[in-house]
């Protein structure tokens, strides 16, 4: 596992439902107010996209259903192999670090451990997650598969762009039987991109897409969409915390199925 690959994410954001105004696809936008919180005051008119690009973790996939069991198994193995001593670090430390480079994640989660322990943790995490996917206990968010099918039936081209490793991202899509719905599944692990901005740029250029919605739960998704001049739909339904995470999104949704309504009401 290359140390330069960015780790997958869990959404960390809570906000009330986005209110969708009827007619002409007009919806409240989100902008930081002077206190740094999000304000639902400015309106945006959405255009129907030719494609939607989805983040995987915290957007389509409930990452914690796979990550947290693997996290505890990982530390059991590290202790057994002599790479780590003491209690397993709090889950919150791991969850709060997701989205960083893997090498930086372990510096936060177990700063006292050796570089060898960090690299072994890289290997174990991917291994345990692939095994967990085979075990069938992980979950997509409610109605994700059905919503994706409905969007595809309406002619929307569907893609994934994730900062995770290739085997992990595609493994999630295959395990949950959504892989056939996507025209392309892009990952930092496959393309060795330094940021999601670059990954989305590659996707857009390769498939000659001019108008897309970037759908995701993290600031990197907002950045990837905006830096590539695309609309950003912020996913605020996983409930893990930083208020500023999705600042700059064109729309916030609190349920994945809201995408169908937004698409239907867009111009």
Residue ranges of each PLM-predicted region?
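Non-catalytic pre-domain segments flanking phosphatase-related domains
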Residues: 4-54
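N-terminal helical cap/lid subdomain that shapes the substrate entry/recognition surface
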Residues: 45-142
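Glycine-rich phosphate-binding loop signature in dinucleotide/nucleotide-binding domains
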Residues: 46-47, 154-156, 206-210, 266
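Substrate-recognition/cap helix-loop segment adjacent to the acidic, metal-dependent catalytic center
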Residues: 78, 109, 152-159, 163-190, ...
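Short, acidic loop-to-helix structural element flanking the phosphoryl-transfer center
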Residues: 131-160, 170, 197
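Structural recognition of alpha->loop->beta junctions
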Residues: 177-186, 244-263
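Conserved Lys-Pro-Asp/Glu-containing loop-to-beta segment of HAD-superfamily phosphomonoesterases
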Residues: 196-222
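Acidic, Mg2+-coordinating phosphoryl-transfer loop and its flanking beta/alpha structural elements
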Residues: 214-251
């Amino acid at each position: 596992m290359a140390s330069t690959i960015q780790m997958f994410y869990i959404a960390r954001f809570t906000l009330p439902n986005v209110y969708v105004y009827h007619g002409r696809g007009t919806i409240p936008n989100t902008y930081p107010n002077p206190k740094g919180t999000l304000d639902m005051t400015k309106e945006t008119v959405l255009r129907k996209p030719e494609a939607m690009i989805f983040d995987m973790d915290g957007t389509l996939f409930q990452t914690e259903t796979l990550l947290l069991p693997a996290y505890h198994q990982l530390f059991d193995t590290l202790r057994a192999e002599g790479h780590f001593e003491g209690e397993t670090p709090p889950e919150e430390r791991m969850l709060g670090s997701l989205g960083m480079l893997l090498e930086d994640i372990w510096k936060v989660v177990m700063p006292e451990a050796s570089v060898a322990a960090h690299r072994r943790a890289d290997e174990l995490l991917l291994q345990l997650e692939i095994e967990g996917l085979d075990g069938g206990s992980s979950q997509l968010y409610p109605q994700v598969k059905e919503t994706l099918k409905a969007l595809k039936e309406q002619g929307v081209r569907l893609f994934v762009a994730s900062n995770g490793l290739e085997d992990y991202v595609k493994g999630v899509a295959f395990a949950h039987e959504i892989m056939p719905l996507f025209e392309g599944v892009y990952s930092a692990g496959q393309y060795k991109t330094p940021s999601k901005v670059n990954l989305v740029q590659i996707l857009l250029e390769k498939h000659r897409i001019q108008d897309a919605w970037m759908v995701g739960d993290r600031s990197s998704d907002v950045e990837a969409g905006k830096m590539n001049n695309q609309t950003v739909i912020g996913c605020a339904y996983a409930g893990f915390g930083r208020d500023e995470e999705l600042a700059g999104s064109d729309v916030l949704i609190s349920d994945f199925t809201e995408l169908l309504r937004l698409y239907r009401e867009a111009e």
